[in-house]
């Protein structure tokens, strides 16, 4: 029969909180939580605790918020907790080798991709953006590299032609929680084998930036649609409509048909429920935008947007231009 492990948890955002919640509901004993220092948030820029801190405090856990784990005092504080294992999920601090060596069973990481594909900061969004048809979570034994440790457990989930970054995040977060509990249960009975990551198929998921969210309509329709879905809910894909930002929340590639090319970014005759935009290097492909947001407005289904503000979207207008019409 498996026994309970002493766990220290390190994580920061909502994605990490899902794993902490699963651990709190498991047979294992979470003895402390590590998370990023409180950050200013909201319009008032009020110091706000991370989702992991809020959850830990609800359950009466001691919370540690060091700015670094590289100094010996911080490492001694961690060592004094006498953890069997440190579980790390989207923590945001680099763990030096001295920290990785502290727990008896080392440090386990919940990573939101099928490693070795999409090591790095934004695996959920990059998988959708690249047109991947599957994603998942990998439980990894951490080493000093960037998401390079041996794999202990992998759980998959499909990516469909309509999956957004937010939807995949919300599916993977609880899946990560289930997987880390399963991994700890197995570790407690010596029933888990570490598999080195293959050297083939390594890709890196660069951190998202607002700068890359502006669409380039010379790109193919399937690529634009994937980018729109990947960047929902952040940083949100956008273009310029008569010089003003038009945010694009949902999109799909239109089935290719023989049609004359026009300048990429040109608004074509609208469908009742979609903005049809010419794209591709020769303007012969079409990307359909089905949910969008005008400045000062809220995201709307394009059907509702056209009913309310159809005059803003005349056929022939070219999107992505700096100048106002």
From Swiss-Prot:
Reaction equations catalysed: L-methionyl-tRNA(fMet) + (6R)-10-formyltetrahydrofolate = N-formyl-L-methionyl-tRNA(fMet) + (6S)-5,6,7,8-tetrahydrofolate + H(+)
MF term (GO), any: methionyl-tRNA formyltransferase activity
InterPro entries: Fmt (IPR005794), Formyl_trans_C (IPR005793), Formyl_trans_C_sf (IPR037022), Formyl_transf_N (IPR002376), Formyl_transf_N_sf (IPR036477), Formyl_transferase-like_C_sf (IPR011034), GART_AS (IPR001555), Met-tRNA-FMT_C (IPR044135)
Superkingdom of the organism of origin: Bacteria
Pfam family, one: Formyl_trans_C
GO cellular component: cytosol
EC numbers, comma separated: 2.1.2.9
Keywords, comma-separated and alphabetical: Protein biosynthesis, Transferase
The protein's enzyme class: transferase
Residues involved in (6S)-5,6,7,8-tetrahydrofolate binding: 113-116
Entry annotated with the keyword Amino-acid biosynthesis: no
SUPFAM superfamilies found in the cross-reference section: FMT C-terminal domain-like, Formyltransferase
PROSITE patterns (UniProt xref): GART
PANTHER family noted in UniProt: METHIONYL-TRNA FORMYLTRANSFERASE, METHIONYL-TRNA FORMYLTRANSFERASE, MITOCHONDRIAL
Protein role: Attaches a formyl group to the free amino group of methionyl-tRNA(fMet). The formyl group appears to play a dual role in the initiator identity of N-formylmethionyl-tRNA by promoting its recognition by IF2 and preventing the misappropriation of this tRNA by the elongation apparatus.
Family: Belongs to the Fmt family.
HAMAP family noted in UniProt: Formyl_trans
Protein name (Swiss-Prot/TrEMBL): Methionyl-tRNA formyltransferase
Organism: Chromohalobacter salexigens (strain ATCC BAA-138 / DSM 3043 / CIP 106854 / NCIMB 13768 / 1H11)
Gene name linked to the record: fmt
């Amino acid at each position: 029969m498996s026994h309970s492990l002493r766990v220290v948890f390190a994580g920061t955002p909502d994605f990490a909180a899902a794993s902490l919640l699963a651990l709190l509901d498991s047979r294992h004993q979470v003895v402390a939580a590590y998370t990023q220092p409180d950050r200013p948030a909201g319009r008032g820029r009020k110091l706000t605790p991370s989702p992991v801190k809020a959850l830990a405090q609800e359950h009466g856990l001691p919370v540690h918020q060091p700015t670094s784990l590289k100094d010996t005092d911080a490492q001694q504080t961690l060592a004094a907790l006498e953890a069997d294992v440190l579980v790390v999920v989207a923590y945001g601090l680099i763990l030096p080798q001295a920290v990785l060596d502290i727990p008896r069973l080392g440090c386990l990481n919940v990573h939101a991709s099928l490693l070795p594909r999409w090591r790095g900061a934004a695996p959920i969004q990059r998988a959708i953006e690249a047109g991947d048809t599957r994603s998942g979570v990998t439980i990894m034994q951490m080493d000093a590299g960037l998401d390079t440790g041996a794999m202990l457990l992998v759980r998959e989930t499909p990516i469909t032609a309509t999956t957004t970054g937010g939807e995949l995040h919300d599916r993977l977060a609880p899946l990560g929680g289930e997987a880390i509990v399963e991994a700890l249960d197995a570790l407690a009975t010596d029933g888990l084998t570490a598999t080195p990551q293959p050297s083939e198929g390594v890709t890196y998921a660069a951190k998202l930036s607002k700068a890359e969210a502006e669409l380039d309509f010379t790109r193919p329709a399937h690529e634009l649609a994937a980018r729109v879905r990947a960047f929902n809910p952040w940083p949100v894909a956008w273009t310029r409509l008569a010089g003003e930002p038009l945010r694009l929340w949902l999109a799909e590639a239109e089935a290719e048909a023989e049609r004359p090319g026009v300048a990429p970014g040109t608004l074509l005759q609208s469908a009742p429920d979609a903005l049809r935009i010419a794209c591709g290097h020769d303007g012969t492909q079409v990307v359909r935008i089905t949910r969008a947001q005008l400045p000062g407005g809220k995201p709307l289904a394009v059907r509702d947007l056209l009913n309310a503000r159809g005059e803003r979207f005349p056929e022939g207008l070219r999107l992505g231009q700096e100048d106002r019409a």
